[in-house]
Amino acid sequence: MKFTIVFLLLACVFAMGVATPGKPRPYSPRPTSHPRPIRVRREALAIEDHLTQAAIRPPPILPA
């Protein structure tokens, strides 16, 4: 008798688990793959600007 009740409870739990649709994945407002490339690109542009400014500026003339 106990085995039958336990088996029926397990069958009900399994049936409910199969019948419910899968939960949607939790929505993350900031996906992990998005902010990093923009930051890296921005840093690369800033470094490039700094290098071009350094290349345009003539080197200082040091006294011999």
Curated annotation (Swiss-Prot):
Q: How is expression of this protein distributed across tissues?
A: Constitutively expressed in the calyx and oviduct of the genital tract of fertilised egg-laying females, but not virgin females. Not expressed in male genital tract. Inducibly expressed in the fat body.
**Segment Critical for inhibition of translation, possibly due to its role in mediating interactions with bacterial 23S rRNA and peptide chain release factors: which positions?**
32-40
Q: Does the keyword Transport apply?
A: no
Q: What is the effect of changing residue 64 to V?
A: In strain: 2CPA51
What results from changing residue 52 to A?
A: In strain: 2CPA1, 2CPA12, 2CPA51, 2CPA105, 2CPA118, 2CPA122, 8B, 8D, 8E, 8F, 8G, 9A, 9B, 9C, 9D, 9E, 9F, 9G, 9H, 10B, 10F, 10G, 10H and Oregon-R; required for antibacterial activity against Providencia burhodogranariea
Q: What induces it?
A: By bacterial infection and LPS. In 3rd instar larvae and both male and female adults expression is detectable between 1 and 16 hours after immune challenge, peaking at 6 hours.
Which family does the record claim for this protein? Belongs to the drosocin family.
Q: What is this protein called?
A: Drosocin antimicrobial peptides
Organismal lineage:
Eukaryota, Metazoa, Ecdysozoa, Arthropoda, Hexapoda
